């Protein structure tokens, strides 16, 4: 396997599991590579799907435009809401659950979600499970970034090459799922459209049949929960529909018809000009006879249209969302023979009906009264600020025919679920929307400090199709545009509920983690930060009209769900990132001081994390004395803010919050003061360790890894154990039964069998070549010996070893259970010995499955 860094890829961007999506790509790559099959190490490597790829039809596309399919028995009410969540989601998956080859071959429970590429060769083909025609099955259509290309990764050894699998570590978010076909016993019943889909543009239309109902999904849709008993899934069941051994490639003939009169579903849409990007059909005035033109995007109701298909007329009526009594109409009876569009009340005339014709990826809208007349965008300015739109006969000139082509975009009113969020500015990444309860009720931007001032509770109103955003500081106050303010500065305040539209916000998704917030009172008004400071120490937050595209506000936001319970309650070791062999330690010394100490696997270094749902923080209890809690001595007179183990006081300085970094480590902050975090210094303590402090400065030792105690990192299987620096060098035994490092010559003597003892929570490491022989610890700087470990003294701790995975390196450290301060390593002369653990390269190993 090569050591090349990951190339240009979107990697794990699609992941629905937060902790996986937050990892650096190199870290997740190491996590997946640790279980790579030995036989494939020299010929294959992990291959992420590149950002720009050559599709199965030899067309170069972005990964977001490659059509993927997933077969699943779960309905849209689950998948469109939650996305595809893998069976294994916990933060400490075991070896087997990250085994890509095992997953691809057997689809066992794992952190992966499987998809298959659409295969194109003049016609369209899709890998299809043989039981897809039994019961209720869904074929989901996916356009997602990143993922691992299984065939590219395993080459000729790919278990099921005809499946053309793309596997997604951490699953797939709902915003990357465009549609679903619902099949009952093999027959398509309806097509579900996902309004939350983040369209990358330039996609082929959703393939449909004129006889198939298309439905735009909504939360708890009454028809969106259809499933049969085979859809039930547990952590012990297999992902049966995507198992590569039970399917084959079939031609996808659904929707093959030359003229489909119903190419889109009924629902709410925006109609974008292909000629003038970001210009949409717009009802200029909310009156009967109001002119319809094209105008730049505003997010307003006047640019949203409700499509309803008439089966008798084989055409659509299109009414304004702003005023449901006004229909998109061509006034064909006007004495002036006008050809402009207007919004008229229902007349029953065919000039209010439109046939929609697919033109590749786009659409034409033909008037039913005269099908030669097509809606056409003009260059001429309208009197209302946009450009005129008329009906005209078909244009054949290839340079100008785009004026008759339109993109019909489903409108999504609800891109996020109700809940608590921080609102981070993307241009000023540490600035968030903040309400500090000041006398003028002003809301501003402030440096993130994770308190209730910066918590906002979003609640969706289905009548207004907009959100109310409630203050976490004062739950009766709403984020409000003070639209009646006399000041020219359009400020934002926190007011009690008035039922005014200026307290509602439409959320417009502009990227995978990017949103704009538009006020419902005037959808041209967007929320943004200026660079001007306020008297309260933050930045001015205001709304500004962006209808001319010239807003100078920082108006792009990342609306982040607030997560505090990152790890389950339980016992952990707390290892430092910079000093990987040092753990947080309390040895009951004078002054109850807590420090960092070389790992020795005793109760001094065991800490029980207990989550408090009210305070949304952890208490961390000592493993050596259950009455003592990890405490910041915030009242200490010393300038050095030390950590101590004190009895319970109820004070906030005994509560801690975790903040996950991209590499899987955590920052541990004190609840009493957000800026204060635990850091390890390089200063020695009188007790043989390193000093731990609580500080608000950027110490280098402030990242920590949590190792949950009692978990089994590797299965009871046979392995070769290769060095970190060279996987072709493995642990073997000499004729004197001492362990040595040697080149991998495929000898049976270099195969080792792990047998886990659940009582001792440690392994025996047996020779797979000679019965009863296993590893024996002798002492520091002595050989690891191969000897009989199945005799009367089988329980001797010298025969047992703990194995821990290093997230930083993607390798394993092997410790003696007899003396956990000692780890297996090797010398310059390739002797395998035990020495004080340091996490140095010569103490790190790969376990390669046989």
UniProtKB/Swiss-Prot annotation:
Q: Does the keyword NAD apply?
A: yes
Q: Which residues cross the membrane?
A: none
What GO molecular functions are on record for this protein? 2'-deoxyguanosine DNA ADP-ribosyltransferase activity; nucleotidyltransferase activity
Q: Which domain of life is it from?
A: Eukaryota
Supply the Pfam families for this chain: RicinB_lectin_2, Scabin-like
Per the record, what are the reactions this protein catalyses?
a 2'-deoxyguanosine in DNA + NAD(+) = an N(2)-(ADP-L-ribosyl)-2'-deoxyguanosine in DNA + nicotinamide + H(+)
Identify the residues that the record assigns to the Ricin B-type lectin domain, covering every copy.
267-409, 413-560, 564-707
Which top class of enzyme applies to this chain? Answer: transferase
According to the UniProt entry, the coiled-coil residues are none
Q: Which UniProt keywords apply?
A: Apoptosis, Glycosyltransferase, NAD, Nucleotidyltransferase, Repeat, Transferase
Q: What is its EC number?
A: 2.4.2.-
Primary role: ADP-ribosylates double-stranded DNA by targeting the N2 amino group of dG residues. Induces apoptosis in a range of human cell lines. May play a role in destroying cells during pupation and/or defense against parasites.
Task: Tell me what this protein is called.
Answer: Pierisin
């Amino acid at each position: 396997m090569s050591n090349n860094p990951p190339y240009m890829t979107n990697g794990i961007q699609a992941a629905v599991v937060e902790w996986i999506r937050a990892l650096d790509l190199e870290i997740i790559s190491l996590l997946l590579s640790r279980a790579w099959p030995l036989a494939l190490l020299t010929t294959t490597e992990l291959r992420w799907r590149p950002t720009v790829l050559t599709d199965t039809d030899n067309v170069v596309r972005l990964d977001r435009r490659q059509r993927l399919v997933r077969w699943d028995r779960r309905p849209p009410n689950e998948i469109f809401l939650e996305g595809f969540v893998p069976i294994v989601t916990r933060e400490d998956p075991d070896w087997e659950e990250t085994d890509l080859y095992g997953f691809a071959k057997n689809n066992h429970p794992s952190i992966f979600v499987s998809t298959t590429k659409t295969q194109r060769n003049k016609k369209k083909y899709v890998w299809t499970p043989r039981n897809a025609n039994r019961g209720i099955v869904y074929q989901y259509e996916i356009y997602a970034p990143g993922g691992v290309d299984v065939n590219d990764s395993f080459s000729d050894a790919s278990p099921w090459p005809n499946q053309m699998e793309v596997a997604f570590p951490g699953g797939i978010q709902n915003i990357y799922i465009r549609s679903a076909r619902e099949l009952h016993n093999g027959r398509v019943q309806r097509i579900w459209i996902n309004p939350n889909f983040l369209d990358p543009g330039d996609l082929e239309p959703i393939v449909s049949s004129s006889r198939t109902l298309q439905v735009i999904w909504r939360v708890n849709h009454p028809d969106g929960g259809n499933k049969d008993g085979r859809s039930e899934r547990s952590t012990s069941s297999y992902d049966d529909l995507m198992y590569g051994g039970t399917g084959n490639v079939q031609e996808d003939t659904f929707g093959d018809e030359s003229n489909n009169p119903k190419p889109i579903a009924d629902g709410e849409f925006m109609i974008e000009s292909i000629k003038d990007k970001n210009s949409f059909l717009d009802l200029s005035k909310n009156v009967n006879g109001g002119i319809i033109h094209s105008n730049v995007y505003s997010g307003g109701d006047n640019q949203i249209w409700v499509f309803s298909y008439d089966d008798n007329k084989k055409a659509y009526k299109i009414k304004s969302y702003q005023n449901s009594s006004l229909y998109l109409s061509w006034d064909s009876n006007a004495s002036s023979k006008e050809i402009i569009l207007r919004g008229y009340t229902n007349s029953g005339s065919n000039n209010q009906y439109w046939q929609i014709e697919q033109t590749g990826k786009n659409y034409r809208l033909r008037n039913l009264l005269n099908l030669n007349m097509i809606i056409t965008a003009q260059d001429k300015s309208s009197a209302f600020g946009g450009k005129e739109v008329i009906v005209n006969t078909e244009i054949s000139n290839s340079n100008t025919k785009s004026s008759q082509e339109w993109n019909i975009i489903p409108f999504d009113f609800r891109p996020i679920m109700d809940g608590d969020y921080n609102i981070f500015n993307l241009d000023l990444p540490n600035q968030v929307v903040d309400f500090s309860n000041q006398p003028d009720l002003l809301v501003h931007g402030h440096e993130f400090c994770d308190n209730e001032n910066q918590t906002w509770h979003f609640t969706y109103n289905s009548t207004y199709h907009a959100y109310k955003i409630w203050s976490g500081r004062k739950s009766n106050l709403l984020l409000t545009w003070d639209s009646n303010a006399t000041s020219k500065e359009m400020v934002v305040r926190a007011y009690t509920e008035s039922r005014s539209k200026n307290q509602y916000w439409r959320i417009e998704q502009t990227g995978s983690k990017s949103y704009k917030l538009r006020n419902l009172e005037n959808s041209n008004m967007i929320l943004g930060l200026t660079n001007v400071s306020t008297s309260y120490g933050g930045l001015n937050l205001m709304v500004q009209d962006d209808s001319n595209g010239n807003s100078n506000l920082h108006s792009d936001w990342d609306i982040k769900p607030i997560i505090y319970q990152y790890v389950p309650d339980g016992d952990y070791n707390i290892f430092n990132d910079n000093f990987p062999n040092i753990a947080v330690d309390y040895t009951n010394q004078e002054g109850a001081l807590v420090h960092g100490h070389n790992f020795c696997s005793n109760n001094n270094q065991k800490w029980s994390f207990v989550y408090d749902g009210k305070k949304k923080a952890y208490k961390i209890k000592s493993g050596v004395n259950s009455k003592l809690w990890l405490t910041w001595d915030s009242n200490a007179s010393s300038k050095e803010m030390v950590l101590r183990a004190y009895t319970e006081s109820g004070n906030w300085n005994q509560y801690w919050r975790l903040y996950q970094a991209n590499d899987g480590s955590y920052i541990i902050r004190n609840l009493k003061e957000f800026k204060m975090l635990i850091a390890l210094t390089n200063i020695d303590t009188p007790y043989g360790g390193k000093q731990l402090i609580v500080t608000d400065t950027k110490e280098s030792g402030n990242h920590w890894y949590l190792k949950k105690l009692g978990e089994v990192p590797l299965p009871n299987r046979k392995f070769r154990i290769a060095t970190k620096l060279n996987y072709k060098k493995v642990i073997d035994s000499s004729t004197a039964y001492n362990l040595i490092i040697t080149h991998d010559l495929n000898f049976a003597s270099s195969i080792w069998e792990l047998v886990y003892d659940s009582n001792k929570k440690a392994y025996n490491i047996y020779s797979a070549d000679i019965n009863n022989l296993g590893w024996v610890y002798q002492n520091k700087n002595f050989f690891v010996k191969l000897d009989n470990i199945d005799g009367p003294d089988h329980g001797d701790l010298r025969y047992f070893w703990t194995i821990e995975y290093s997230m930083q390196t993607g390798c394993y450290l092997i410790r003696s259970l007899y003396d956990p301060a000692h780890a297996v390593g090797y010398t310059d002369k390739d002797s395998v010995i035990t020495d004080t653990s340091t996490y140095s390269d010569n103490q790190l190993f790969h376990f390669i499955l046989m």
